[in-house]
Amino acid sequence: MARESLPFGMFDVDYTDIEARRARRMESIYHVGQERIWDGRDVLAELIERHGKPKLADRERSALSQIFSVIMWGELAAWKISAQLTDVIVPLEGKLAASSQVHDEARHFYVMHAYLEALGHTPPALDYWSKRVLTMTLATKSLAKKLLGMQLTIETIALTIFQRVRELEVEPVLTELLPYYERDEARHVGLGIQLLPALVSEMSYAERVDFAVFHLDLYGSAVMSLKSLEPALTSIGVDPRSLLAIGFRKQSDIDAMFREEFPSWPLDPPEKRVFAGLCELLFPTEVVSRRERVLAAIDVMRRRRPGVLEIESEKRAARRADNLSRAAVNGAF
């Protein structure tokens, strides 16, 4: 996948209006990243000085260690993958954005490692499914698949976990550290959104089918990874269904942005239906027998009934609207 020569033609590009807009956005990702660089050593040291080293019961400490060791290794994978992207992306603007991400991911990895050391718990080995998600993305030679795996799957999962753990205020140092990560990861997702539509538009029918199969395999492995983390997540008060709801909303936003850039992007592709059915099978909306769970998952895939993704997302949206209404009423007085 690596290039053995310099891309001397990177400036000989005649952009369409859409391509020029994407280029400006990617260049902006780079410059915003430069403006918002933060020193991980100083930030973590200041937070520990303010709150003291993390103090948690053994059960919560073990759970946080398991969850964020997955994040830590994901950051290392992201570091390696963003370096690969920097080499193979040809447009200058995309190369700049990917270069900015390399620096971000290096910082994310060493700061998370330092936090886990402060937590005082040896990070456990990765579970099979988490390792599979990272390995699939690292191993593929397809730029489109790397962007899908890194920018739009691994980064989205990380953002989802960061948001929910921060909302629950599980541990004060982590609660104040995670917004730095979230801000960076949101930019990284933006790079994938700008680059991937053009790559998909150039694919043959067979290549799109292969891409869809990879997409489903990757997402299925990610959900199985979440299932593996379920005991640890519930130990710190995180309902995996809430993560699915946040992830579903983020993915819906990404799909909407994709359709803006690539109008023929399908509204409800088959892999999305299968993914919804798998989520219903593993995280059912109600306690039922195994047979009923399978039948419910099939109905969700056929869009005959809403599944856990839609139901939990609607619940979360309703709670957010209720909180905003209460805030407005309280503010009025």
Across the structure, where does each feature detected by a protein language model lie?
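Terminal targeting/low-complexity segments that flank the catalytic cores of oxidoreductases
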Residues: M1-L96, E117-A125, W129, K141, ...
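Short linear motifs at secondary-structure transitions and domain/linker junctions
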Residues: D42-A45, M136, V170
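Alpha-helical transition-metal enzyme core signature, strongest for iron centers
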Residues: I71-W79, Q101-L116, Q151-L159, Y181-G192, ...
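Short, well-structured alpha-helical segments
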Residues: K95, S99-V102, T175, P179
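Active-site-adjacent scaffolding segments
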Residues: F109-R166
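Aromatic-anchored, glycine/proline-accented short structural segments
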Residues: I161-L226
